[in-house]
Amino acid sequence: MKAELIFTGTELLLGHILNSHAQYLGMQLSGMGIEVVLHTTVGDDRERMSRAFREAIERSDLIIITGGLGPTTDDLTMETVASVLGLPLVLDERSLAAIEEVYQRRGLALTEGAKKQAYFPEGAAVLPNTRGTAPGALIEKDGKIILILPGPPHELTAMFENSALPFLSEKAGKGAVMRYKVFKLTGITESMVQEKLKDLGGQGNPEIAYMAKPGEIQVRIQARAGNSELAQKMVDELADKIRPRLEEYIFGCGEETLEGVVGKLLLEKRLSLSVAESCTGGLIAARLTDIPGSSEYFKGGVVAYSNEMKKEILGVPQDILDQHGAVSRETAVAMAEGMRRMAGSDLSIGVTGIAGPGGGTEKKPRGLVYISLSYAGGAVCHEYLFSGERRSVRQFTANTAMNILRRYLLTKPD
């Protein structure tokens, strides 16, 4: 089954809000073995919406339209779909009663715009909205399936999972099923990953896809088969070939995060951590504390941006700052060691660098970063030169720092 997604709303078209529906629906449909062939975003314009819908019907088996179901004059989805399909709009009394009840609870008078939400193309199955006032619709006509969903994400997900998912799963069950696995890597570039896997690519089914983020590469294995067991077997067999080639760079799979993996290792080893940050501005500490229960292993952190703070709070000696500068191997080590002493933690990370866009010199260019890890009995420090704009350099640095810690914890005996 081939699917096409049409996202309506001028706010999406202009980039005023993020289109999270594309990711959510894409993952839901691909997980059922439904192939998504095209995304279209169209503004609140009747003629353009009609053209997009008409073209989608000609190309695809399943058309999902999101947004445009509200009470205002620019909410045109139901009217547009009915017009293209040559169907009249008819009142659904049950939907109208539900809308009236919501308005009464809120102490509001029912408007004509609100009533509009209770009209649907003739023959449509009405999908109740448990989190809002605008119902959706499911239409089967001439061998095509048209699914109409609300725009707000929390309304869309509830309606899709409660009403549309069971129907689509049954339809998709008659065709191919898709399964996938995602490896998450750090400390390696996308081109290096592709080089290591070049003889495994190009199979078509299963297939390998790559996605790069600052400091992280994702390798996605995807397979289609007539049943879930066979599809999973195809994924697992390819994963078994990939893992040995990338073992040292893989930090997790699926929804795992680097900070979550590091947290688990710290708990397993019964070790505590603190961080001293300069160029990352607290990003490492923020990510570590995103993990529930991180207080079990994370003692705290300091953002020492100025030389004065490095000296007064972390105890970085003035002669190190004078002789080597704030961005240096020596300063990074002194930051990590000073933080570990102050926090009383088993381990500490010290980070200093030049995130840019200014501040770089010929000897110390933009993107130069030093990352130190202090532990009982010593410290290590690594030098990096990251490329990209300021935000990317900071993200690369945070990921690399946590990966240095991860690799240390993996080699440290219990």
From Swiss-Prot:
Source species, domain of life: Bacteria
Gene3D superfamilies, A to Z: 3.30.70.2860, CinA-like (3.90.950.20), MoaB/Mog-like domain (3.40.980.10)
Transmembrane segments: none
Family matches, as InterPro entries: CinA (IPR050101), CinA-like_C (IPR036653), CinA_C (IPR008136), CinA_KH (IPR041424), Competence-induced_CinA (IPR008135), MoaB/Mog-like_dom_sf (IPR036425), MoaB/Mog_dom (IPR001453)
Pfam annotation, one family: MoCF_biosynth
Signal sequence bounds: none
HAMAP family in the cross-refs: CinA_B
Family, per entry: Belongs to the CinA family.
Name of this protein: Putative competence-damage inducible protein
Organism per entry: Pelotomaculum thermopropionicum (strain DSM 13744 / JCM 10971 / SI)
Organism ancestry: Bacteria, Bacillati, Bacillota, Clostridia, Eubacteriales
